[in-house]
Amino acid sequence: AADLEAMGVEQMQPVITGKKTYIAPFVNAEKPQYLVIEDSFPNGRPALEKGFGVYMADRETVNLSERMKVTVCLNPVHSATGPLGVVQGYELFAHMLNTNEDMMKMARMIAYDEGLPVVPNPGILSPQAFVDELFHDRFPNEYLGDTNMRLSVDVSQMVGIRFGETIKAYVKK
């Protein structure tokens, strides 16, 4: 809000309702958008794929796309670095990676060195391009406001899914 007001856009501060709901006159957004939908519509469908970042695919491709994100490329980086960011006193995930060289090195190691060599390629999204985009566009974006505390909340319940598939892939090698 302060950055928008500094550019001359007025009245950008969030409003807090009586029920403690925060309402802002703007949305923090990012360019990367991915929506992978199973193309199984028995009664026909609109041309959903004409939307930016919308991919229509068969069930296997949808599953591979989800696996790429959840078990290798994005979520494991959050799960490994978020709790350490909390312990180190970093509120925002992006700020932590932008200012702490060691945390950025660890995040890159998890995605590039450990994940990419064993991630199944869904064919419609390139795992390499997806990870590159994370580190060049998404992770450094402090306007997203993603907190390390949020990333840490469910880590104990997600260890198996976020790291297990990668470990299993290495065991198979």
Language-model features: locations:
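Substrate/ligand-engaging "lid" and interaction regions
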Residues: 1-173
